[in-house]
Amino acid sequence: MDGINAKYVSKKISKTRWRPVSSSSLQQPDIFATGSWDNEDNSISIWSIGENGVSSMDDEFEGDPQLLCEYKHNGDVLDLQFLDQDRIVTASSTGAVTIFRHHHNSQTLSVSQLWERAHHYPCNNAPCTGVVCNSPEIVTVGEDGRIMLFRADQEGVLRTIEMADSSAIHAVTFLRTTEILTVNSIGQLKLWDFRQPGNEPSQILSLGGASRTGDRVPLHCVDRHPNQQHIVATGGQDGMLCIWDVRQGNMPISLMEAHTSEMWEVHFHPSNPGHLFSCSEDGSLLHWETSSNTDTPSLQGGRNTSIISRSAIAPAGGNQSLINAWLTGDSSKGHLETTHMLPSQMLSVNSLDVLGQCLVCGTDGEAIYVNRYVPI
């Protein structure tokens, strides 16, 4: 576990996100944000692993994250996304959606915008469970089954999809500029097109009988392949990693045994999507890597991975062998290696983010882990 710095922060960490870096620069990320949950006072915090955060204190180790600033957050931070270099959007268990501004010169945070009851039931608030940003647009989802579209610097709501779901929506991501994907508590993946009027999804895919037990397993997280937008990864209550091709059928293409309990987040590497990362309630963080130069799937870290292939159809475009590894688990065309990224621990790894060679994650063990040398 070389290259990992652990920082104990006395708060359960629910979300971790790197501040984006310019795509034209070759620099590695050095600033990240965290949100906390299940604490007496929750907060959003900004941390540095670069020169900004160098401390002369004797008890600080080189490379340890240094706290730059923090701000009290009303309710649990259920999701967190950078809108741009300066602004961060949070989703709260109170139903609120907040934009915070990070002032780099003074190293302070302030509330830039607040939609207090973005998600609600008739008589009380509903947790806002997910947020995704494509500046200036912000999409949120909640336990109330609503999808909300906001625009930064505009007070009102741009669009509301009422009763988008009769069950709780757990996560959201952009598929394309005008299309989003949501996952819900009954194992469904839904596609929505904001160009279409009305409250109906353009497509519904379902785990259904494809789950390990055949039951409707709640899905907790979703991410799309950065280059092949039709390829989507999800994770849920049963800990399985599901790969979907939204152009084909209405069930996942591949299911892979990943974790022994809930998978909280899954992320393709944004610039090297042959790499994927997942974290779980079981205390593990896995690095999945596709490879096409050997015939046998291998696993590092002492766990068995079984791959259930639903289809062996080769998708159009892209690196066929690497994409086939995601879609089919076909070891003759490509295979998956899985590596444990953290020392064994008992408490949940709630969130992760990866950018360049840097990975950050947050846990219920009140710790933040940073790895600056992820083998990508």
Residue ranges and their predicted role:
Residues N350-I376:
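Blade-level signature of beta-propeller repeat domains, shared across WD40, Kelch, NHL, RCC1
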Residues M1-K7, S24-C69, G95-Q113:
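Beta-propeller domains
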Residues D38-S45, T94-T98, T129, D144-M148, ...:
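Short coil/turn segments within WD40 beta-propeller repeats
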Residues H102-E137, G145, T160-A168:
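Asp-box/WD-like beta-propeller blade repeats and closely related beta-sheet repeat scaffolds
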Residues N5-K7, L68-Y71, L114-P122, R159-A164, ...:
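Short C-terminal beta-strands that terminate individual repeats in beta-propeller domains
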Residues K11-S23, G75-F82, A118-N134, S166-F174, ...:
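Canonical WD40 repeat/beta-propeller blade segments in eukaryotic WD-repeat proteins
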